[in-house]
């Protein structure tokens, strides 16, 4: 009888075990204007840039049941979309996708680099928010 109880407890524990999955890596970068000047106080997701235009969004994780993860046999995809906005500038969406990114270890990072916000001057009203322009690093 005692062996049955221990066996049932062990199976229950194994089936309810959780593992940590990534829902958003730590995202960091700098927001600049079209003249390559840093922009302070830009809303980036749930945070704001400092006066040098730098920002950092914390990593987000969630717990997933081991049994469910075993059935899929691969790490889940990660899709992140964060809105950047500042009065006087055209808002944009920063997007990140990794087809198996949910399996990354704790401490995952995405260093974006420089993101260019365009001034609202001489722009017509848009129904859709465009993707952000990311300035690539010169080699």
Residue ranges and their predicted role:
Residues 24-28, 33-48:
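Short, ordered, surface-exposed loop/turn motifs in non-cytosolic proteins
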Residues 67-102:
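A short, solvent-exposed loop/turn motif at the edges and junctions
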Residues 45-68:
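Short, acidic Ser/Thr/Gly-rich low-complexity loop/linker segments typical of extracellular
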Residues 35, 50, 88-90:
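Solvent-exposed strand-loop boundary residues in beta-sheet-rich modules
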């Amino acid at each position: 009888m005692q062996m049955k109880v221990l066996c049932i407890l062990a199976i229950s524990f194994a089936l309810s075990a959780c593992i940590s999955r990534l829902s958003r890596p730590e995202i960091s970068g700098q927001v600049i204007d079209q003249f390559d000047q840093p922009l302070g106080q830009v809303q980036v997701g749930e945070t704001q840039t400092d006066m040098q235009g730098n920002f950092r969004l914390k990593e987000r994780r969630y717990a997933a049941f081991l049994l469910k993860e075993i059935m899929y046999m691969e790490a889940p995809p990660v899709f992140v979309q964060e809105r950047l906005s500042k009065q006087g500038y055209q808002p944009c969406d920063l997007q990140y996708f990794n087809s198996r990114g949910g399996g990354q270890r704790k401490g995952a990072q995405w260093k974006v680099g420089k993101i260019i916000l365009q001034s609202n001057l001489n722009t017509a009203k848009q129904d859709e928010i465009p993707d952000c322009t990311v300035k690539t690093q010169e080699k």
